[in-house]
Regions:
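DNA-contacting interfaces and partner/effector-binding or oligomerization modules
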Residues: 1-72
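Amphipathic alpha-helical repeat elements characteristic of tetratricopeptide repeat
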Residues: 7-10, 75, 121-125
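Amphipathic alpha-helical repeat scaffolds
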Residues: 14-17, 82, 128
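Charged low-complexity stretches with an acidic bias
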Residues: 62-90
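Short, charge-rich, low-complexity alpha-helical interaction segments
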Residues: 83-105
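Conserved binding-pocket/active-site segment within a compact domain
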Residues: 103-134
Length: 134
């Protein structure tokens, strides 16, 4: 993983963890938009996975708040992701990322839809940038 991408993902994870701890779920939208922007620029799997993660967390948290349902506590897994990437243990980080995405998928059957929405937003952002620059 490129060092610039790694540092950027660490910033995103840190912001996500803080928002999660303070239950500022509305912040996930802005964080998600930033990660989608990064996924568009870097076009790598790691940036895309983080974009999907943050977007899905925002959707799940919003639904839990609206319905009064119980949300899964993913904070320990988010902290583990952050720690693994901070230590540059990339293979373990990627395995942990797959696990947390699987856990969200098990909790929310709409996960496949979130992936498609992130990909669509990234395509739109890329298309608008191409149009902007001629």
């Amino acid at each position: 993983m490129n060092e610039i991408i790694r540092k950027d993902i660490l910033k995103v994870l840190s912001a996500t963890i803080e928002a999660f701890k303070q239950q500022r779920f509305q912040d996930f939208s802005a964080i998600s938009n930033q990660t989608i922007h990064n996924a568009t620029i870097y076009q790598d799997e790691d940036s895309l996975a983080v974009a999907v993660l943050v977007y899905a967390l925002g959707k799940v948290a919003t639904r839990c708040m609206e319905t009064g349902g119980k949300c899964p506590n993913l904070l320990p897994q988010l902290n583990a992701l952050d720690g693994l990437l901070a230590q540059d243990r990339q293979e373990e980080y990627r395995a942990a990322m797959r696990k947390i995405l699987d856990d969200i998928r098990a909790f929310d059957e709409k996960m496949h839809m979130y992936i498609e929405e992130v990909l669509q937003k990234a395509r739109l952002k890329k298309g608008s940038k191409l149009h902007e620059h001629g």
